[in-house]
Regions:
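Conserved beta-strand element within WD40/beta-propeller blades
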Residues: 1-3, 44-48, 85-89, 128-132, ...
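Short coil/turn segments within WD40 beta-propeller repeats
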Residues: 5-9, 50-54, 91-95, 134-137, ...
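Short C-terminal beta-strands that terminate individual repeats in beta-propeller domains
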Residues: 21-28, 63-69, 106-113, 149-155, ...
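Canonical WD40 repeat/beta-propeller blade segments in eukaryotic WD-repeat proteins
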Residues: 30-38, 71-78, 114-123, 157-166, ...
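Short coil/turn segments that connect the beta-strands within blades of beta-propeller domains
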Residues: 41-43, 81-83, 125-126, 169-171, ...
Length: 503
């Protein structure tokens, strides 16, 4: 908050409205602060009447001058990524500056000189949006070239434009004037901005401030007379099988919210700005899959981990498997693709005709190892008698193992150094990945599982429970008689329980 005594205060307001407000920082300036922006990845940006742009650092409680233009600062706006900002000055100049690393960063410095002071300004995904008293809304490219213009000079009912804000997706713009809000949306197909029907509100008077909620669902408008109006910004709503509400707040952004009380939703957004066409909730209502014309989005709803990968339209014949907590397995036309949740790239792709969770094993950093930062391994079937092994970090084949009988189950241990597999004759085999040495360890095997968090193996052979406490010595086996069939091995709070179903 910038005050008229040239002091900027930072308040800690808490999570709830009723919490006590506490001043945590104070920055004294030599000139009046005319505008403020706070990029999510950097310090607070202050625009001053003397033309200086200053950065206020909350951790050190110190401010520094980033640059000086000798022209009154009339607007400061941050980009949606929170890595940079634009400053508008009374002489019409617009300056771009970055406060954090940005892979898509453009050249810093003066971008363009607008015809009037840019009192209303926003930084969209592809353009710089400017408006003011001349009743024009102008869109500049990132290089400062005029791309588009909407001129309302001949509209007698229109007054000067006072403020604007951009949607979190960067694809919708709201511009405020007298008793009116004008809306513009970016058309990905047409590659231009389209004007939507204006919203008129009698006795709202001049709109002096606009803010778009981070999830894109609402716009707050402040007026000259002290009123604050809250508007919904929704393209459409739908309900998925009575369990989830899908709110399309923009072409490339959807709010996915469980209808169950107390549940938190996720913001599904295309990082490339593509229009989201289809959203599905899958995997026991724990995962989502969405499509755009050029990409596919997958996500873990419980951990709010979202991924977007390039994906051409293949007719919608994909099959999805969510048995692994770390990766989504996508099977299409004989090809298996692995997508790690939270990563915007395909982890790996292999050819296989056997798409069964029991015939594929993926380990993604399941257990930390000393001296190993990334450990990602894949085991799958080339044919019913051949197991292939892949290192997904470096993208090369670790080797293959051929068996004399058809394989019906396989699983890597958590470190990816050992592989257990069982054949149709119920023979259990162990393979060391480093040496590619295969050892037969058990006959008549009806159940087998690695104990979570360890290299201990539990299996069943006829009426015996077999345990390997040291898998490095497979000949050392502990056998206990049981009555029934083992159905699961559970490890909780440092204890391991074997679940047996009585016959």
């Amino acid at each position: 908050m910038a005050q008229t005594d040239n002091i900027v205060f930072v308040y800690k307001i808490g999570d709830d409205f009723g919490e006590k407000k506490v001043i945590c920082n104070k920055f004294i300036q030599t000139s009046a602060v005319t505008c403020i922006a706070w990029p999510s990845e950097g310090p607070i940006i202050l625009g001053c009447a003397d033309g200086k742009i200053r950065a206020a650092h909350c951790k050190t409680n110190k401010a520094q001058t980033l640059y000086n233009t000798d022209s009154y600062v009339c607007s400061v706006v941050a980009n949606n990524a929170g890595t940079g900002f634009l400053s508008g000055h009374a002489d019409g100049s617009i300056v771009r500056w970055y406060v954090a690393e940005d892979q898509q960063a453009k050249k810093q410095g003066k971008v363009v000189v607008h015809s009037i002071p840019p009192y209303a300004m926003a930084w969209a995904s592809q353009h710089i949006c400017v408006a003011g008293p001349d009743k024009k809304v102008v869109f500049y490219t990132q290089d400062g070239m005029m791309a588009q213009q909407f001129d309302y000079f001949r509209d007698a009912t229109e007054k000067e434009f006072t403020t604007m804000c951009i949607s979190p997706s960067g694809q919708a713009l709201c511009v405020g004037s007298y008793d009116r809000l004008r809306l513009y949306s970016w058309s990905q197909r047409k590659n231009l901005w389209e004007e939507n029907k204006a919203k008129e509100f009698q006795y709202l008077y001049s709109v002096t401030a606009l803010a778009w909620k981070k999830d894109g669902s609402r716009i707050a408008a402040g007026s000259l007379c002290g009123g604050v109006e809250l508007f919904e910004s929704v393209l459409k709503r739908s309900v998925w099988k009575g369990n989830f509400e899908l709110t399309y707040v923009g072409p490339s952004q959807v709010l996915v919210k469980p209808l169950a009380a107390g549940s938190r939703g996720v913001i599904l957004k295309s990082i490339y700005g593509y229009e989201i066409e289809d959203v599905r909730i899958m995997g026991g209502d724990s995962y989502l899959v969405a499509r755009t014309p050029e990409t596919m989005l997958v996500g873990d709803l419980g951990r709010n981990l979202l991924s977007e990968i390039p994906w051409v339209n293949s007719g919608g014949n994909e099959k999805y498997y969510f048995d692994n907590d770390n990766v989504c397995m996508i099977f299409n036309a004989g090809e298996l693709s692995l997508v790690e949740y939270g990563k915007n790239e395909i982890l790996g792709s292999v050819r296989t005709e056997f798409m069964n969770p029991h015939l594929i094993s993926v380990r993604i950093n399941d257990r930390k190892q000393r001296g190993v930062e990334e450990n990602k391994k894949l085991a799958y079937l080339l044919d019913l008698k051949t197991v292939a092994l892949e290192d997904l970090v470096f993208g090369y084949a670790l080797g293959q193992v051929t068996h004399d009988s058809k394989i019906d189950w396989l699983e890597l241990n958590e470190t990816g150094r050992k592989l257990l597999f069982r054949d149709k004759r119920s023979r259990l085999n162990l393979m060391d990945i480093e040496t590619m040495q295969k050892t037969s360890v058990l006959n008549y095997c009806t159940f087998v599982q690695w104990v979570p968090g360890s290299d201990v193996v539990v299996a069943q052979s006829r009426d015996n429970m077999c345990v390997w406490y040291n898998i490095e010595a497979p000949e050392r086996i502990t056998m206990l008689p049981i009555k029934g069939d083992i159905v699961d091995v559970v490890r909780e709070e440092g204890k391991t329980e074997v679940v047996v179903q009585a016959c």
